[in-house]
């Protein structure tokens, strides 16, 4: 069995991620060359913005924060946190010139400028992972895919008034049963959701929780699994608010910080993680852009039918454009050796930071999408959200990889 969790947009850490990425969107929309490292802290009645920004853009950060908090759903002081009454403190510095010099002029370009993609160095050292598997149509692990679906539906029924007693904070967790490496059933579903103290005339705590349990099954679980081949059955455990009432939540219940939900943001623990968060960072930061590129590589390999599972590691040195290493691992599911897959990757994927920026248009996308891009992936996962038309989710190189692998295999058999 394997478990993964997700959180709703009203979770304290996710509030921070969304504000951080709303800042990235606003700055890149006005100035695509902005350098951003925006960190956010939330607590009862407080939002603190800090980090480093170098940009020509002029942004009203206080208004941005209030608008995002209101969009999430914190518009009533009864929720313990309110968009219009919370204090907003802004404490940004400029990016260090020592860091900027390595990004502006990579090691490879000093003395030579033959290739424009050698001009931009990695913004930091680090290692990033990308992953894909054939458990879902979007080529994501099933546990995290289901957890995100439940969290998204939980927010939907709150916002559209289906369950008006729900409040913004919430978490989900799904445990999937596997046999011989393939998902076969749902072992446990867990939903914890913030709610009002009473539901209409229902005031007794046990009765409130009983109503919540019934409503969540009908309005959240049932729609999520309606068209999926694997469904909960009579053996599935269904847990809701296991500690009892969940009235105090959001920043009133727990402080939140940007970058504390990196497993929720990626593959739910199913794949390794390099440790770097995504939100609040402009795409010159390889923590973000290279993780997107590694997902793109892994997804195209799986989409090509060359493996059932694929994990790609890439690492960088600060100020150096070319990756230090690339690793391809298919966990014994590859149709061709991992070493040959690595050669395909090296031939067909340019993982230098500037090449990633150019191919995915990571600096231009916020402006192209009307000022909203990164904040949309700051909740419910940076991967697998195919409805958002994310460039790293495309499988436009799958056919090429498949054809070249087939040609290689045919040549070996000739």
UniProtKB/Swiss-Prot annotation:
Q: Which domain of life does the UniProt lineage start with?
A: Bacteria
The protein's location, in the record's own words, is: Cytoplasm
Q: Tell me the protein's name.
A: S-adenosylmethionine synthase
Q: Which UniProt keywords apply?
A: ATP-binding, Cytoplasm, Magnesium, Metal-binding, Nucleotide-binding, One-carbon metabolism, Potassium, Transferase
Q: Which PROSITE patterns match?
A: ADOMET_SYNTHASE_1 (PS00376), ADOMET_SYNTHASE_2 (PS00377)
Report the source organism: Synechococcus sp. (strain JA-2-3B'a(2-13))
GO MF term (any one): magnesium ion binding
Q: Which reaction does it catalyse?
A: L-methionine + ATP + H2O = S-adenosyl-L-methionine + phosphate + diphosphate
This protein's cofactor list reads:
Mg(2+); K(+)
Question: Listed GO cellular component terms?
Answer: cytoplasm
In residue numbers, the region (Flexible loop) covers 95-105
Q: In which pathway does it act?
A: Amino-acid biosynthesis; S-adenosyl-L-methionine biosynthesis; S-adenosyl-L-methionine from L-methionine: step 1/1
